[in-house]
């Protein structure tokens, strides 16, 4: 199945790439945006109430300077760059639970603070730099450049979201509920279920990717999207640990505007600091529909490949063996219901099986009214009912979250 997925993507890449020069209104160019595609492949960033003034001032100054610039190309050219778009936001969280033994975790936390800058060079190359801090942990999230001259064929290199998972590339503002699904966190590389020390990577890796949107319709939407990424497999801010590369990719169909269906594939491995290498062979199916501010999204993913902790060496014989099932899967369904111009309520069912069997299932039922009083100000009160078969003492409990989002 892995070979069929890779070959299907390879065949699609071989289709001659041509820009649609007869319908500029179909693929309208949007300056200073990383991805103006309807198919989401990376987080969509926006300026906030402070950075909007900064960006406007920079853009105004650059326009005056560019009026005197000669239009030519070369290593000494310094014009033909867009005004960089700065942005940032923070998410604060209060959490409480009635789960036995977990009350000490109740309280306020800093979920994250992010700063980013986007822009273009020569109009054909887009770049992004994004950094994040979680309490005392400061690290680089994204750094990449993408040649994007044609919507049918783009080339990206750097550190960015893996080509695996529909929810994975979403900005936290756009997920709906107050956290990513268990599927996304465990099976797309956010805090991967293999359990090694360097697998909390926010679904990102370092590598090179080609992607594009094919076959424009009369109403402007594109029927087909593809991505194919070759990456280290070790995650962010670290060098490769073995000679093999991970391959991730997707084929997505948009038969009518707003309806998306498709599949992702991932084959590769991860080498931990103790020298143990585990395989990651995964597939994912999804559907998504957005219309009139109503939203629906569902995903199913399956993984084969052991955890690092499954590797055992007998202390007497020295023989190595693997424990566990070497499988995991998860699925979720969520719907967003528009209520008022400032209120949209999200419902979500989220399930994950850590060893691919029902005895390891953890189900979360969530209700989350999202309160948008301003484009740059959002509140998320959320109630979760959790049924966790992995917990013997208290498998059923309730959680309450309150998250505050501010884009500055």
Model regions and ranges:
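C-terminal closing repeat unit and adjoining cap/tail of repeat-based domains
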Residues: 366-382
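Outer membrane beta-barrel
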Residues: 75-236, 241-248, 252-261, 334-339, ...
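N-terminal periplasmic/intermembrane-space "pro-region" immediately following the signal or transit peptide
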Residues: 5-7, 15-91, 408
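Outer-membrane beta-barrel "beta-signal"
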Residues: 371, 376, 396-408
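Extracytoplasmic loops and strand-loop junctions of Gram-negative outer membrane beta-barrel proteins
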Residues: 98-100, 189-194, 233-234, 269-272, ...
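Detector for outer-membrane/organellar transmembrane beta-barrel domains
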Residues: 81, 252-355, 363
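Outer-membrane beta-barrel proteins
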Residues: 97-101, 140, 166-169, 180, ...
């Amino acid at each position: 199945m892995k070979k069929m997925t890779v070959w299907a993507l390879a065949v699609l890449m071989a289709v001659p790439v041509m820009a649609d020069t007869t319908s500029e209104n179909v693929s309208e160019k949007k300056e200073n945006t990383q991805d103006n595609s309807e198919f989401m492949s990376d987080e969509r960033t926006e300026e906030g109430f402070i950075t909007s003034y900064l960006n406007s001032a920079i853009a105004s100054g650059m326009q005056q300077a560019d009026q005197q610039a000669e239009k030519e190309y070369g290593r000494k050219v310094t014009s033909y760059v867009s005004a960089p778009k700065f942005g940032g936001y923070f998410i604060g969280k209060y959490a409480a639970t009635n789960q036995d033994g977990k009350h000490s975790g109740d309280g306020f936390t800093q979920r994250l603070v992010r700063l980013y800058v986007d822009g273009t060079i020569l109009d054909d190359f887009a770049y992004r730099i994004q950094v994040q801090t979680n309490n005392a942990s400061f690290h680089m999230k994204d750094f990449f450049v993408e040649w994007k001259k044609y919507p049918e064929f783009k080339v990206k290199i750097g550190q960015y979201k893996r080509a695996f998972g529909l929810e994975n590339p979403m900005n936290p503002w756009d997920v709906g509920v107050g956290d990513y699904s268990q599927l996304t966190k465990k099976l797309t590389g956010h805090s991967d279920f293999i359990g090694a020390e360097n697998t909390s990577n926010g679904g990102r890796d370092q590598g090179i990717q080609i992607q594009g949107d094919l076959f424009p319709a009369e109403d402007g939407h594109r029927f087909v999207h593809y991505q194919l990424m070759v990456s280290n497999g070790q995650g962010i801010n670290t060098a490769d640990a073995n000679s093999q590369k991970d391959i991730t990719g997707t084929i997505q169909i948009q038969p009518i505007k707003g309806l998306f269906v498709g599949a992702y594939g991932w084959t590769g491995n991860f080498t931990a600091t103790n020298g143990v290498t585990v395989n990651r062979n995964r597939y994912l199916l999804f559907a998504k529909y957005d219309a009139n501010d109503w939203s629906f999204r569902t995903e199913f993913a399956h993984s084969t490949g052991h955890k690092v902790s499954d590797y055992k060496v007998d202390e007497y014989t020295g023989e190595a063996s693997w424990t566990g099932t070497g499988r995991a899967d998860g699925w979720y369904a969520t719907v967003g219901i528009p209520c008022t111009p400032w209120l949209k309520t999200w419902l979500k069912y989220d399930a994950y099986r850590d060893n691919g069997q029902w005895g390891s299932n953890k189900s979360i039922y969530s209700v989350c009214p999202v309160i948008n009083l301003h484009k740059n100000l959002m509140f998320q009160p959320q109630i979760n009912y959790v049924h966790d078969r992995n917990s013997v003492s208290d498998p059923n409990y309730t959680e309450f979250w309150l998250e505050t989002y501010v884009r500055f």
